[in-house]
From Swiss-Prot:
Pathway: Lipid metabolism; fatty acid biosynthesis. This is Beta-ketoacyl-[acyl-carrier-protein] synthase III. Gene3D superfamilies: 3.40.47.10. It comes from Ruegeria pomeroyi (strain ATCC 700808 / DSM 15171 / DSS-3) (Silicibacter pomeroyi). The active site is at residues 114, 250, 280.
Length: 323
């Protein structure tokens, strides 16, 4: 027998404001066709004025709790992945904890940029299998619209705001790859590449700053590293690409998504794709895609799912789980 962290509920929230590609034609030297052809993105959601990352996270958390059929008081811990917390401190996770009316347990943020949700899943899994928590609420939430340079057409058209959440719960499994729950994790980072994707602000500068990215270099690293980490995670679970029902990748760019699937030898009809509707929502993109994939009827109980992501740091990783 082996303890597993099993998905019991999933949910997401998107701000009401939808911004199509055409909206950028008024202020930037760009077109809808240019954005679509290079990224696959057609539209994205932006938070309203005064709407914060913790607001989005709370709405997604409420949806996941409802899907799981449990109350916030039954949660032992909250792990929230974000790079755009409302304040330097306290954590966005503690803000969500308060808004959910959860007075027990503990809550903390994880920051690994676009790889954040994979890192958060790893943390939540460790809490559960080590006996430190029975139920963990795992959230990815971002308001990247707050750190965009609206004069930089190479970045500002790519990102969106949103949140997604999972409820993980301890269950006994047989200790085989047929168990439901998280089967394996692979995490990596290499700080030598920190200048490829970063924000030029923070406490040391006393400014919020804006996102800066060397897109071509990020793309070059992304496909190679994403396929590698996914295959490593599968190998750790005693599985291979042939066993995969769904890849649920970080939704950064359709060309990265396609390139990774091809490198893994998997057809695109085994990939959950939401980038066209949400843009790159950083740490929110994987839980958003998991929630949408379930709602579409793509992801079903018993399916083998691989999530993989790469972000600033560079940081990257993958999680293999049976839904």
């Amino acid at each position: 027998m082996a303890g597993r962290a099993v998905v019991k509920g999933v949910g997401h929230y998107l701000p009401e404001r939808v911004v199509p590609n055409a909206a950028f034609e008024k202020t930037l030297d760009t077109t809808d066709e240019w954005i679509r052809s290079r990224s696959g993105i057609e539209r994205r959601h932006f938070a309203a004025e005064g709407e914060t990352t913790s607001d989005l996270a709370t709405r997604a958390a409420e949806a996941a709790l409802a899907d799981a059929g449990i109350s916030a008081e039954q949660i032992d811990a909250i792990v929230l992945a974000t790079s755009t917390a409302d304040l330097t401190f306290p954590s966005a996770a503690t803000m969500v904890q308060a808004r959910l009316g959860m007075t027990n347990g503990y809550a903390f943020d994880v920051q690994a940029v676009c790889a954040g949700f994979v890192y958060a899943l790893s943390n939540a899994n460790a809490l559960i299998v080590s006996g430190q928590a029975k139920r963990v609420l795992v959230i990815g939430a971002e308001t990247f619209s707050r750190i965009m340079d609206w004069t930089d057409r190479s970045t500002c058209v790519l990102f969106g705001d949103g949140a997604g959440a999972l409820v993980l719960e301890y269950e006994e499994g047989e200790g085989t790859p047929q168990d439901r729950g998280i089967l394996s994790v692979d995490l990596n980072s290499d700080g030598r590449y920190k200048d490829l994707l970063y924000v030029d602000g923070g406490v040391s500068t006393q400014t919020t700053g804006h996102l800066r990215m060397q897109g071509n270099q990020v793309f070059r690293h992304a496909v190679e590293k994403l396929a590698q980490t996914a295959e490593t995670a599968l190998d750790k679970a005693g599985l291979s690409s042939a066993d995969v029902d769904w890849i649920v990748p970080h939704q950064a760019n359709i060309r990265i998504i396609q390139g990774t699937a091809k490198k893994m030898g998997l057809p695109m009809d085994k990939v959950v794709v939401t980038v066209q509707d949400h843009g790159n929502t950083s740490a929110a993109s994987i839980p958003l895609a998991l929630s949408v994939g379930k709602a579409r009827g793509q992801i079903k109980t018993g399916d083998l799912v691989v999530t993989e992501a790469i972000g600033g740091g560079l940081a990257w990783g993958a999680v293999v789980l049976r839904w």
